[in-house]
Amino acid sequence: DFIGRTSELATLNAELERGSGFVVIYGRRRVGKTTLIKEFIKDKRAFYFLATTESEAQSMKRFAGVLSRTTKNPMLSKVTFTDWLDLFQVVADDHPDEKKVLVIDEFPYLVKTNPDFPSILQNAWDEVLKDHNVMLVLCGSLISMMKKHALAYDSPLYGRRTAQIRLMPLQFTDVYEAQNLSFEQAVEQYAITGGVPKYMEFFQ
C-alpha cells in the first residue's frame, strides 16, 4: 500500500496545474521514487518510460512501444525511429487539449548511452513539449549524475526545471500511522528499515 508522501504529491499536482511543469526527482535506490511517480500518474494520461543500459536504438524502440500502448496506435511500434524529437512530437500531438505527463525514469542511463541526450531533451522541451500541455518528470537514482545533467548550471537543462524533489526515506509518523502496529513495534521496525520502503516490504 502507498504510504505518506503527502507533500511530494502536492508538489507534483501543483506542477500539473501550471502551464508547463518540468520536475526533477532524485534520491537513493529503494527509497520509493518510482512508487511515488506511479501513485501520481495512476489517474492521469501518462507516458511512463523506464530507461535501462540498453543501446539507444533499443531505447527508442521501447519508447515507441510506450507511445503505441498509451495512444492505442499500433502503427507506432512498427515504425523505426532514429530521432528522439520525432518521438517527443508524438507525445506533444497526443490529445492536445488534455494535460499529459511524460516520465523518464532512470534518466541517467540515457545520458550514459548518449552524452548528448540532455541537449536533445533541452531542444525537445523548448521546441516541442513545453507549449503542448506536457508535464515532464525526470527521475534517477544516480544522484551525482542527476545533479550534473539535470540540475547543474552547466547542464543544457539548467533553468528548465520548475520543481525538484529529493526523495528521502519515509517519516516515522507516516510509517506508524499507516500500519496496524503498536508504538514499540513501529519503533523497532523503523530502527531496522530507516523508513526505506523497499526494506519495509520484508515486514509485510
Where does each model-flagged region fall?
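Phosphate-binding site recognition
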Residues: 1-204
